[in-house]
Regions:
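Bacterial N-terminal signal peptides
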Residues: 25-39
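Bacterial signal peptide processing site
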Residues: 40-45
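Post-signal peptide N-terminal segment of mature Sec-exported envelope proteins
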Residues: 49-90
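Beta/coil-rich, acidic/histidine-enriched accessory regions frequently appended to metallopeptidases
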Residues: 51, 57, 311, 343-421, ...
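Juxtacatalytic substrate-recognition/specificity segment
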Residues: 99-115, 122-245, 260-263, 294, ...
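Acidic/His/Gly-enriched intrinsically disordered linker/tail segments
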Residues: 123, 194-218, 222, 240-380
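Noncatalytic modules at the cell exterior or secretory-pathway interfaces
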Residues: 421-425, 498-510
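Surface-exposed beta-strand/loop patches in noncatalytic accessory domains
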Residues: 434-490, 532-544
């Protein structure tokens, strides 16, 4: 949580005239030839950064052992520097390796190349400037709304530094600042010379070095969201040699931009949106749900294979946000994922991601499938996280097991392996409390029918089977019987014949955004059917006789 600083904001002119937004384009012919719909931020490549803007630190290594640097000037081994990368910048903008120098040198960020504008002349034309420590905002929009935007960037800057690390200092000692251009009347900005002739077309926003351009938005929330999104790009990519792939660059810009401002003025970034009304104009959760409804669900591999051209449409922004949100909020994966924040300009980024995905491949694919199919506003990632525990079979000597299942968590392992073709008796007892408002609702294992979730009463105990890693699939659609999306109702109890071998997982049915206020646990007993248990005893006796 960060409080928005009360930074002085410069207001130098009266209200500017509003007009209907148009695509930024130098000519009608070019607009006709290049018009296309792009959602979210538009991909662009910054012009070359002068090589003298960045210095390096070299130690007493031989020339053949020279090291490269990450975004904070930390040295990388020659082995790490050879790892395969996919930089999201034009190769022409990537600086060549400076001559070897054994003397330590100070690392500086690239020089500030923002143009100097005549703010008084712009004010006379109807374009105001609002300035804080980190943002100089030029806009022709309403003064009251515009005045609050630069302090928001000052607040998110602190969150960037905490997550990614501080940028190297400027050569002249100045603070890092951006220019933002928030546009209602395109012609006004173009006539004022605030839109570069070589700036590619965009529908919502575009950035270049420490400048960004964005259109005025219908909703207050999405105006702030887009502002933070573009500013995040400026911060993440200002140092040369970006190694992080496009899904991470766009996903993290979306992730930081999802924010909530409290009544006391404090602001939270990287939040899970709670409702379409409070996050008006954003729509990423709806896009993911619509994608699954259209049988266009995306796997982790699909998302990480995307290139910049894929982001000429809006859906990849939603899926990239979803993957970053999932990995950063999940208690099992977030520590490893957050290490990537210091590797944006580091060639080790790709090997670190590969190690993360390889180490947790089966669990990741399983939980991503569940996350992306169950995603809803207010989704509780911590409560939904699964503690995977492989089960063991019941035996004639231990024909049953009893397991507590908490009401405030998602899927929980029973520790029992159900074998294909075997029939099991599952019984449940106990009472739990669902929600506190408008009053506490008590439920038994069969659930309560005053409210339903996924077409079942909330409070109903349900189960599913989780297969071993060698049976994993990374394809979330269609529903396969070997995935945890194929669940079944248990209630007070049921007789269940396993169609395939897997560990039994259980949970109390409730919306994924409502788990945190549930209390209590039910007791679940799992045992073989009488016939199967007797058959198992006969097999056990025959094996003992043979061994003797």
């Amino acid at each position: 949580m960060t409080a928005i600083s009360r930074t002085a904001v410069c207001d130098t002119s009266p209200n500017g005239a509003a007009s209907v937004p148009r695509l930024l384009c130098a000519s009608p012919l070019l607009a006709t030839a290049m018009m296309f719909a792009i959602g979210g931020c538009d991909r662009t490549v910054p012009p070359p950064t002068p090589l003298q803007s960045k210095q390096i630190t070299s130690q007493s290594a031989q020339p053949s052992e020279r090291s490269s640097l990450n975004r904070r000037g930390q040295q990388l081994s020659d082995e790490a520097a050879r790892r395969d990368t996919t930089a999201e910048t034009d190769p022409a903008t990537t600086p060549t390796e400076p001559p070897f120098d054994s003397k330590p040198q100070t690392i500086h960020r690239p020089d500030d190349q923002r143009p100097q504008h005549d703010d008084r002349r712009l004010a006379e034309a109807g374009i105001r400037v609002y300035e804080s420590e980190r943002l100089k905002l030029y806009t022709d929009m309403d003064a009251e709304a515009a005045r609050a935007l630069p302090p928001l960037i000052d607040a998110v800057y602190l969150a960037w530094v905490e997550y990614f690390g501080e940028l190297p200092p400027a050569r002249d000692g100045s603070a890092f600042q951006m220019n933002g251009y928030l546009i209602r009347d395109e012609a006004l900005f173009r006539e004022a010379g605030l839109v570069p002739e070589d700036l590619p077309l965009f529908e919502h926003g575009r950035h270049r070095r420490n400048e960004f351009w964005m259109r005025e938005q219908k909703y207050d929330y999405f105006r702030r969201h887009l502002l933070i999104h573009e500013a995040t790009h400026c911060f993440m990519t200002y140092m040369p040699g970006v190694a992080a792939p496009v899904w991470y660059i766009e996903g993290m810009a979306e992730y930081f931009a999802t924010h909530r401002i409290e009544s006391d003025g404090s602001v939270h970034f990287r939040v899970m949106p709670t409702s379409p009304e409070d996050f008006a104009g954003w729509g990423r959760i709806t896009a993911i749900r619509d994608g699954f409804a259209a049988k266009q669900g995306q796997t982790i591999r699909d998302i990480t294979d995307w290139n910049p051209r894929d982001f000429l449409k809006p859906e990849p922004y939603a899926w990239s946000w979803g993957l970053c949100q999932f990995l950063d909020a999940h208690p099992r994966y977030r520590e490893r994922f957050r290490k990537l924040g210091s590797l944006v300009q580091d060639r080790a980024f790709h090997s670190e991601v590969a190690d993360l995905f390889r180490e947790f491949e089966h669990e990741l694919n399983t939980e991503w499938e569940l996350f992306s199919t169950n995603l809803q506003y207010g989704y509780k990632a911590t409560h939904a996280a699964i503690d995977f525990q492989s089960g063991t079979p019941l035996t004639p000597d231990q024909p049953q097991r009893r397991i507590p299942i908490a009401a405030d968590r998602g899927w929980q392992s029973s520790g029992v392996l159900l074998e294909a073709g075997q029939t099991f008796e599952i019984t449940v007892s106990g009472r739990i409390t669902l929600a506190d408002q408008p009053k506490p609702w008590e439920s038994e294992p069969q659930g309560i029918t005053f409210r339903y979730f996924d077409r079942r009463p909330i409070g109903l105990v349900i189960g599913c089977l989780h297969t071993d890693a060698n049976s994993a699939t990374d394809k979330p659609l269609p529903v396969l019987p070997t995935t945890m999306r194929k669940d079944f109702a248990i209630g007070r109890g049921c007789s269940f014949t396993a169609s395939h071998t897997g560990t039994l997982y259980l949970r109390v049915n409730d919306a994924w955004n409502s788990l945190d206020d549930n209390r209590g646990a039910v007791s679940v007993t799992v045992e073989r059917s009488r016939a199967d248990n007797e058959a198992a005893r006969k097999v056990d006796r025959r094996e003992n006789t043979f061994q003797n």
